[in-house]
Every structure is written in structure tokens, then in C-alpha cells.
Amino acid sequence: MSTEEQNGVPLQRGSEFIADDVTSNKSNNTRRMLVKEYRKIGRGAFGTVVQAYLTQDKKNWLGPFAIKKVPAHTEYKSRELQILRIADHPNIVKLQYFFTHLSPQDNKVYQHLAMECLPETLQIEINRYVTNKLEMPLKHIRLYTYQIARGMLYLHGLGVCHRDIKPSNVLVDPETGVLKICDFGSAKKLEHNQPSISYICSRFYRAPELIIGCTQYTTQIDIWGLGCVMGEMLIGKAIFQGQEPLLQLREIAKLLGPPDKRFIFFSNPAYDGPLFSKPLFSGSSQQRFEKYFGHSGPDGIDLLMKILVYEPQQRLSPRRILAHQFFNELRNDDTFLPRGFTEPIKLPNLFDFNDFELQILGEFADKIKPTKVAE
């Protein structure tokens, strides 16, 4: 059998096994199927991801799927499966099948989540522009940021917090402009007055309240992550790169100014770390945003300044983000030019809100839809 190296890890093409309990997420029917793994496409904190195909008869193959393998009988496995089983949204990766299998390598049982497969992550797309010393087109940044916010509108409406929003946890198809949030290994349904661990979310995208140890946080930590991802698309690198958790707060203070003592107290009264109370730059925070993100235009700067805010309750909600004027170009022009194309194509459908979304949007629906759609 031939081998291929993906992310430095060789994997035999054609490695296969029989799974006895392959359950369809759509029909709930369970059957015995052959699983043929093709190549490794990712590795996360809670498991690995391979591209694979499924078949009952070795003639009719289903896939390709992105199959995430995580140790069975863990709290994270249980949460991720529960969330993916109910999630049904164009900007959330779709679970197609799930099953368990005893690994011959370590004799442990693994949960396998077979999800739809998209060509690459947003991190890869950002890196491609950086490698070629190019800026990602502003239309693409609008398109991707909008879809992340729309996915969050749905998730947060369910009470689910992703808790690890970053470019490598967002899938994209650059040829169609479609984006889907993936990797729900850290996701959790937040309950009012129920504490959650603060050491969550990858450091560069961690909201300030998490850095100082808040355990009563809200889904607004995802909004902070969205702002970090948007900023990274604009400048080609993570905007806050602290080399350790507390230094991450210093990096944030370089852009936003020092955190308010009230914010510190209400996030975690027991916090006794550095406050970075002295200004780390001259001029205003507005000037700092303009220096770093000026090419996003006044609307882009305005949006970022309303997302990257210390106080969680002051960050824009998903519906207010979707209604922001930064996305007016998506409402006024329904085409974009994919990388490598010579002619523009239609944008993916951005305004086909279902009843659940419309209920959350309320009066904002008419502000978000293009006039011709709203009518």
C-alpha cells in the first residue's frame, strides 16, 4: 500500500477496518460498514482527524468524510456528540455518521465522528496569502467573518458556547466561499450560575475574562475569538501573541489600553496577577486600531472596536454583528472573485434564515437582509 505524508505524519492509504455500529445521524439507523481511511488531515487537543470513506458492499462508497477520533467514555466526547447531533445549520459542520471502534494499536475504544469534508481550514487560507506576501481581499474577509457570526447566532441561540474559536477550527471552501465552524471538542452548553473552567480556548484567542480566571463567563467569549480571527485575516498573523497566559493580557493592553479595575473585580475578585495599569502606548485606542487595521476601512475598524472590548456585555451580539455596516457590500453585491478565478461567481446564500434564526434576529432580520430579499 502506498503512503502519504500529511502534516509530517505518514499514513497508509487504504488502511481499513469494520465498524459494527455505524449510526446515521439523519435516520438513526445503525449498520455494519467498512471504514477505509485515506489520509490524516488534522490533529487537535482531543483527537485526530482523517479523511475516510464508508461502504457496506465495497462497491458503493460514501464520502469523503472528515472522521474525528476521540477516546470514548469521556466528558468531552459526550458533549461533542450531543451538540453535533442537534446542530443543523449551513455554517456548522454537519455530522453524518458516528460509531465506536477498538483500536488495535492501543486496545482502547474510540468514538468516531464522520463529518462533511471541506477542502481546508481558514488558517491554511490565511497562511497562503501570507506566503505569497498578499493581503486577503476585503470581500473575502467580510464573507468569512459574516458566516462565523451567523454560525454563532445559531449556536448561542441553542445556549452552546464553542469555547475554541480560531482559524484552524473554521473550515472553508475557497472556490465557493462557504465557511463552517468545526471542532466542538471544547464546546459546552452554558447554564446560568453554573461555573465552567476558565483555562479553555487557545491562548492567542482567549478572551480577557478567561485570562484572569473568570468561571461565570458567557458565550461572549466566542465573540472575542471572532474579533481575533477577523483581525488575523486582516494582518496575516494572530493579533495578540503572548508567550504565556498572563503576558497575553499585556498584548491585549497594548491595543485596548489597560483593563478597568471594575472589569477585573467582576470577572474574578481573587485575581492577584499583573494589571498592566499603565498605558503601554501613546495616543488613543482608536489610533492604535487605525494603525493595525486601517486597510479594513472605517467600518471595519468600527466593527473590531465594538467586538474587542474588555467588558463581555459590551461586545456586539451575533445579530448586531450581522447587521453592521461592514457587511453592506455583501448585501449590495452578491458576487465575489475566488482565489485563482478570472470571473466573479455568486456568493453562497447568506440570508436564507430559518425560523429559529428569524426568532433570534427579531427586528434585526430586515436590517440584515438585502432590501430585495427583505421585501
UniProtKB/Swiss-Prot annotation:
Family that this chain belongs to: Belongs to the protein kinase superfamily. Ser/Thr protein kinase family.
Organism listed in the record: Saccharomyces cerevisiae (strain ATCC 204508 / S288c) (Baker's yeast)
PTM comment text: Phosphorylated at tyrosine and serine.
Residues bound to ATP: 41-49, 68
EC number: 2.7.12.1
Domain of life where this protein originates: Eukaryota
Keywords: Acetylation, ATP-binding, Kinase, Nucleotide-binding, Phosphoprotein, Serine/threonine-protein kinase, Transferase
Active site: 164
Domain Protein kinase: from-to ranges: 35-327
Catalysis: reaction(s): L-seryl-[protein] + ATP = O-phospho-L-seryl-[protein] + ADP + H(+); L-threonyl-[protein] + ATP = O-phospho-L-threonyl-[protein] + ADP + H(+); L-tyrosyl-[protein] + ATP = O-phospho-L-tyrosyl-[protein] + ADP + H(+)
One cellular-component annotation, GO: cytoplasm
Miscellaneous information on this protein: Present with 396 molecules/cell in log phase SD medium.
CDD domains in the cross-refs: STKc_GSK3 (cd14137)
Protein name according to UniProt: Protein kinase MCK1
Main function: May be an autophosphorylating tyrosine kinase, a bifunctional (serine/tyrosine-specific) protein kinase, or a serine kinase that is a substrate for an associated tyrosine kinase. MCK1 is a transcriptional activator of IME1, it stimulates spore maturation, and play a positive regulatory role in both mitotic centromere function and activation of early meiotic gene expression.
Modification sites for Phosphotyrosine: 199
Pfam short name (any one): Pkinase
Modified residues (Phosphoserine): 198, 202
GO terms of molecular function: ATP binding; cyclin binding; enzyme inhibitor activity; protein kinase activity; protein serine kinase activity; protein serine/threonine kinase activity; protein serine/threonine/tyrosine kinase activity; protein tyrosine kinase activity
Entries under InterPro entries matching the protein: GSK-3, Kinase-like_dom_sf, Prot_kinase_dom, Protein_kinase_ATP_BS, Ser/Thr_kinase_AS, STKc_GSK3
Gene field: MCK1
Signal peptide start and end residues: none
Modified-residue entries (N-acetylserine), positions: 2
